[in-house]
Amino acid sequence: MDSFVEGFKLMIPAVAILIFAWSLKGMGDALGIGVFVENLVGTNASASVILPAVMFMIAIFLAFSTGTSWGTFAILVPIVVAMFPGQNNLEMMIISVAAVLAGAVCGDHISPISDTTVMSSAGAQSNHINHVSTQMQYAMVVAAVCIVGYLIAGIVKIWWAALGSSLLILFAVLTVLKRREQKKDAEEQHA
């Protein structure tokens, strides 16, 4: 019986997040947020171009602040789906939902209050803040490339073209970083 009570206690935050997400979606529907954003984006071509990148950054911020990717999914995915009613902008809806999912996972990954980050540092028996600061450096490089990729996706509206160009950009960035590090190591050896 004790395990039942303990298990229920562990589920309370997840249930609360879902209830708040449903409430937020209900308020958004009542206020017509989806229609407002659709009209704003529909009349402004530049807004639709940057929408996936903006949603990616919002998801990173929200997941970093709350320490949960699933809560961010529950809050932002219904909002993004409501922005694209019908079949007329299906490609942009898919790209924007992907941006939310990726941003939420990135924000959760670098958040010092995320359960996965806490468990990773505890499992590795390392200082928690050192663990957060070391993984943030790598994640921010990839996040910057993702922002460029989502801008490309907003322009071309073809997911595989954006993915391919993002991979090429990431390869170029990593190559430049590697060469810079090799040059720095060579200078230190000669000094």
Positions of the model-derived regions?
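Membrane-interface alpha-helices at helix entry/exit sites of multi-pass transporters
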Residues: 89-91, 124-139
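Membrane-embedded alpha-helical segments of transport systems
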Residues: 102-111, 135-149
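Core transmembrane alpha-helical segments of multi-pass membrane transporters/permeases
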Residues: 1-35, 49-61, 65
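Short amphipathic alpha-helical coupling elements at transmembrane boundaries
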Residues: 2-10, 35-43, 118-122, 129-133
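Membrane-interface capping segments at transmembrane-helix boundaries
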Residues: 175-188
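Small-residue-rich transmembrane alpha-helices that serve as helix-helix interface/gating elements
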Residues: 161-173
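Hydrophobic alpha-helical transmembrane segments of multi-pass integral membrane proteins
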Residues: 18-21, 45-93, 100-108
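Transmembrane helix-loop junctions in multi-pass membrane proteins
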Residues: 25-37, 65-67, 146-160
